[in-house]
Amino acid sequence: MAKHFEFTGDERVFEGVTVHRIRALVDLPELNVVAGDVGGWVESEDNLAESAWVMDEAVVCQDARVMDSAVVSGNAVVSGQAKVSGSVVVTDNAQVADGAKVSGSAVVSGQSQVRGKAKVNGSVTIMDNAQVCDDVELAGVITVSVNALVCGNALVTGEVLVTDNAQVRDDVEISGKVKFLGNAQVFGSALISGSCRIEDDAQVFEHAELYGRVRVKDRAQVHGSAVVYGKVKIKGKSNVH
């Protein structure tokens, strides 16, 4: 594709680097951009490829690449060696940084951050003050919201909700239609699949495995080498190991 933008001549310093305001040279119908529209800020022409666009006061800088029909808007920042592709939207005050890769139809919004070497693909929504970082992989129809944290080497696939102050970290593997609510914590090498629900101050950790429709709530703990499956409710101060 021929070059689809130019520098307007406006520039400013952003976090120690000079960034340039851009202007569209061609229509980008899928993004509702027409030739002549003024966009956001980039450090170099290499920051935008294909028909990707940056608008408002958003910034794409350093070695970051925004590709395909992805859009960066609002006051969002894409930096480092991050790659944003597909039909991804990064907006509001969100940040995608370091070596993170966001693809598919993901939306990163609010004050959320995707950092480290995190890989995000599919219909993923990361919003509010959520953080996704380190070597995490998210793939599927996943929502990470409010103050939730997904970090470490966690692998999360399927139709998963991580919200409130929930944390999913370390080497855990999550799949299916799992929900993490409240102050729930899942860490260690835990494995959870099916339609499980972890909520309140519950914890699942070490090598515990949950399958089926297990619900862990209140201050219950499931850990050690425990394997729980079927339609089970673990509550109160229960300690299963």
Please give the residue ranges for each predicted region.
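Terminal amphipathic alpha-helical/low-complexity segments used for targeting or macromolecular assembly
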Residues: 1-51, 57, 75, 87, ...
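Compositionally biased, low-structure terminal segments
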Residues: 6-8, 15, 181, 188, ...
